[in-house]
């Protein structure tokens, strides 16, 4: 890795500072706005560099088309958007898309330039974990303060942010003690956050990581993988047992899951499905009603990517989103000759795909995951295979 004080580390640092607004400084402050302008300018520049200078993995074909679609609809929203409820920001849609997706290009470019390497992650991962932990407790305090009565247990959305950290842990594949300790740390907060979707994805990631770590490990090291896996299972079982005894809300969440209750999501989904199938306009059926139109229907988002897109961008939008995942899958499979990159891309694919089914995925990718994704994609394209070894 090149010197610590480089453009890539500055870029990541600025994003970290931006996302800590509300914890380290006032949310929506002048500082946050200035930082956002700077990092978005850097991101747009790097997106152009990536497309004009480098031969990109097929993943970027899907990302380019998806991003262009969102840019088109977001621009139309800013120019029109009279269907939005009063007080809804017209620029917020486009801003969230750019924040979520553009950093992938920057991480890719910086990796190709040698500014991001495994040493970068060894520097940033501890910092990221500290920042996300601060965000978790800060969010916990805010949400609990808004509760009435004696109940002080909530679901904490920052659990999904801990999920987004897990793929980066593949960097420590040669140091399994560190890798599995950090994995266990993330699992603890994911369980504590009580977000059922986050827990499901985390379990899938854990199984995927352990199985593939065992597969690619030398035979004399496989016993250590089994040992660490067993220790994680024992530790998590202890945490779950403690929560079952001490947390009434945790028991309620389990009962709701077993009973098939979805916190009202089934009702919300039904509203959008019914609206789509009662659509009489061919143009709206094919091209949607416009960005954030779900707010005009139910005064809230669909909380499911495919429903959100089919209402906003129509059947064509869903086809574009599907092609994005197909190209993502193809890129992931092409990395099979590089085991660690294959595992890393696989974990990110699992996160993105499952979040698209029961959450808002494309608009909520964290800088931690997009940096990791861009890095793996950049390393995949390196001509010197020796640099692909983690």
Model-derived regions: residue spans:
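Transmembrane signal-anchor hairpin modules in multi-pass inner-membrane enzymes, especially those
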Residues: 1-76, 115, 171-177, 381-390
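Hydrophobic alpha-helical segments of polytopic membrane proteins
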Residues: 2-3, 167-244, 319, 333-337, ...
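Aromatic-anchored transmembrane helix interface
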Residues: 33-41, 57-78, 84-109, 127-129, ...
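Hydrophobic transmembrane alpha-helices and their immediate junctions
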Residues: 59-60, 313-353, 371-380, 384
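Alpha-helical transmembrane segments of multi-pass inner-membrane proteins
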Residues: 109, 113-143, 153-212
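Flexible juxtamembrane loops connecting transmembrane helices in multi-pass membrane enzymes
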Residues: 220-224, 237-271, 291-296
């Amino acid at each position: 890795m090149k010197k610590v004080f480089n453009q890539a580390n500055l870029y990541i640092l600025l994003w970290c500072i931006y996302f800590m607004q509300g914890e380290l400084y006032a949310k929506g402050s002048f500082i946050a706005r200035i930082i956002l302008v700077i990092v978005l300018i850097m991101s747009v520049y790097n997106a152009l560099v990536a497309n004009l200078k480098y031969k990109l993995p097929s993943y970027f074909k899907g990302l380019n088309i998806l991003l262009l679609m969102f840019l088109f609809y977001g621009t139309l929203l800013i120019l029109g958007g009279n269907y939005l409820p009063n007080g809804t920001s017209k620029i917020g849609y486009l801003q969230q898309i750019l924040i979520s997706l553009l950093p992938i290009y920057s991480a890719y470019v910086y990796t190709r330039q040698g500014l991001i390497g495994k040493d970068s992650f060894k520097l940033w991962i501890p910092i990221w974990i500290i920042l996300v932990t601060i965000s978790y407790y800060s969010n916990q305090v805010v949400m609990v303060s808004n509760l009435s009565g004696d109940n002080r247990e909530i679901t904490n959305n920052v659990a999904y942010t801990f999920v987004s950290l897990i793929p980066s842990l593949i960097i420590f594949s040669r140091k399994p003690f560190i890798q599995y300790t950090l994995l266990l740390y993330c699992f603890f907060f994911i369980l504590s956050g009580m977000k059922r979707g986050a827990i499901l994805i985390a379990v899938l990631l854990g199984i995927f990581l352990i199985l593939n770590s065992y597969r690619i490990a030398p035979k004399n090291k496989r016993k250590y993988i089994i040992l660490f896996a067993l220790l994680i299972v024992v530790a998590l079982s202890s945490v779950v047992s403690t929560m079952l005894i001490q947390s009434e809300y945790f028991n309620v969440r389990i009962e709701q899951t077993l009973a098939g209750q979805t916190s009202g999501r089934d009702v919300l989904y039904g509203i959008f499905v019914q609206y789509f199938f009662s659509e009489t306009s061919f143009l709206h059926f094919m091209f949607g009603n416009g960005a954030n139109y779900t707010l005009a229907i139910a005064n809230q988002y669909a909380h499911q990517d495919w429903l959100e897109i089919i209402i906003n961008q129509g059947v064509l939008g869903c086809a574009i989103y599907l092609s994005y995942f197909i190209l993502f899958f193809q890129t992931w499979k092409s990395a099979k000759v590089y085991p660690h990159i294959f595992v890393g891309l696989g974990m990110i694919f699992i996160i993105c795909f499952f979040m698209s089914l029961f959450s808002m995925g494309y608009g909520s990718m964290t800088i931690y995951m997009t940096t990791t994704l861009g890095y793996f994609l950049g390393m995949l394209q390196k001509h010197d295979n020796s640099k692909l070894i983690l």
